[in-house]
Design a protein with these regions (language model features):
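Conserved strand-to-helix beginnings and helix N-cap segments that scaffold or border functional pockets
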Residues: 49-50
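Conserved beta-alpha junction segments in alpha/beta enzyme cores
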Residues: 9-31, 39, 46, 182
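Residue-level signal for tight coil/turn positions that link beta-strands
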Residues: 31-32, 127
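C-terminal catalytic domains of large/alpha subunits in multi-subunit enzymes
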Residues: 2-9, 15, 54-330
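Immediate post-signal peptide segment of exported/extracytoplasmic ligand-binding proteins
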Residues: 1-4, 33-36
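Conserved short loop/turn motifs at secondary-structure junctions
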Residues: 41-42, 98
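Short, aliphatic-rich beta-strand segments
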Residues: 34-39, 203-205
């Protein structure tokens, strides 16, 4: 017999702890207006370099395609950074990139002032051109500004930006700490089908609702959520490192069971976009948060289906059958 159940789990996740957690970015613009970004948060498949390049382009006021190279985590050239951990990259490194881009825009305005003969507060850098906000002066291409500066100095236009989240540790009056500047939130709902004869659990539907702030790149956010849910499904149903006397009993993927594409259901996503004032263009983060509520929601769905609580992961067919049998015998 197969029974279905629905489970729900909600989580919060802290972003960018204050203290020793700075981020730095360095840009240089060549004579054609194209920009190289130097950052230290490695992109290991999550798409952070793409998202950060989008932030940079917006902050400078140039097309995204003008960010032609991203040098990430090169110990010879990149600034120091804490790394791609703790779902911090969009918030911490993103703010550093935004600040660096704004500094480069300030430099471009100062150089455009010399060409356009108007004050910098009357100049806007938009879509790769310096515009007079009154429209009385012909726009100047950023590439022309950059070429003029390189011809004059022999150096590209450079800018540096840094950001460090603020944390309050042990306030002297209240004794309270504010370690994290912001948090992300998520709720996930899952429907499962449990075979009471074999103990097998099959996920039939998943809904994931996440507050990640403003989405810089919605497609990358959805990829992160799908990846986190896939990891959570493995944690909940199949993945387990078996140890005996300090030795791993299942050291290969032939006996350490990862979920495949056949195990991942269609995932309905609901984005709750809030505007985080301290984040880069309102963004917060997404990454690990997608993993957090997945296994609890699955275990709650198993309970809803067959009335048994699985209290250790993974919820293998053997554990589910044992729990069903124990309930029947009670």
């Amino acid at each position: 017999m197969k029974k279905r159940g629905v489970g729900l789990a909600t989580m919060w996740y802290p972003v960018g702890p204050g203290g020793s957690n700075p981020g730095t970015a360095r840009f240089h613009m060549d004579a054609d207006g194209k920009v190289t970004m130097f950052i230290s948060s490695p992109d290991v498949g999550q798409g952070s370099s793409t998202a950060l390049a989008q932030v940079a382009a917006d902050a400078i006021g140039i097309p995204f395609e003008w960010i032609t190279k991203v040098v990430a985590a090169d110990s010879d050239e990149s600034p120091a950074d804490f790394g791609s951990v703790g779902s911090r990259v969009t918030y911490v490194q993103g703010n550093a990139v935004r600040i660096c881009g704004e500094e480069m825009q300030t430099r471009l305005k100062a150089l455009a002032h010399e060409i356009m003969n108007t004050s910098t507060d009357r100049i806007a850098i938009v879509d790769g051109k310096a515009h007079d906000i009154d429209g009385k002066i012909e726009p100047v291409d950023v590439g022309d500004i950059a070429r003029r500066e390189v011809e004059r100095t022999g150096q590209p236009i450079e800018a540096v930006g840094s950001f460090a989240p603020v944390g309050v540790y042990g306030d002297r009056v209240t004794g309270q700490s504010i370690v994290y500047p912001t948090f992300v939130y998520a709720t996930q709902i899952v429907e499962v089908e449990v075979d009471t004869g074999t103990g097998e659990v099959r996920i039939t539907r998943m809904v994931a609702s996440h507050d990640s702030g403003q989405l810089i790149n919605p497609l990358l956010v959805e990829g992160q959520i799908v990846g986190g849910i896939a990891q959570g499904i493995g944690m909940a149903l199949s993945e387990e490192v078996m140890l005996r006397d300090g030795r791993t009993l299942n050291p290969s993927l032939s006996d350490y069971f990862l979920p495949t594409a056949m195990d991942i259901p269609d995932i309905e996503m609901v984005h709750v976009e809030t505007d985080e004032e301290s984040g880069p263009y309102g963004a917060k983060c997404v990454g690990e948060p997608a993993l957090v509520p997945t296994a609890p929601a699955i275990l709650n769905a198993i309970y809803d289906a067959v009335g048994v609580r699985i209290t250790s992961l993974p919820a293998t067919p053997e554990k589910v059958l044992e729990a069903i049998a124990a309930k029947a015998a009670a």
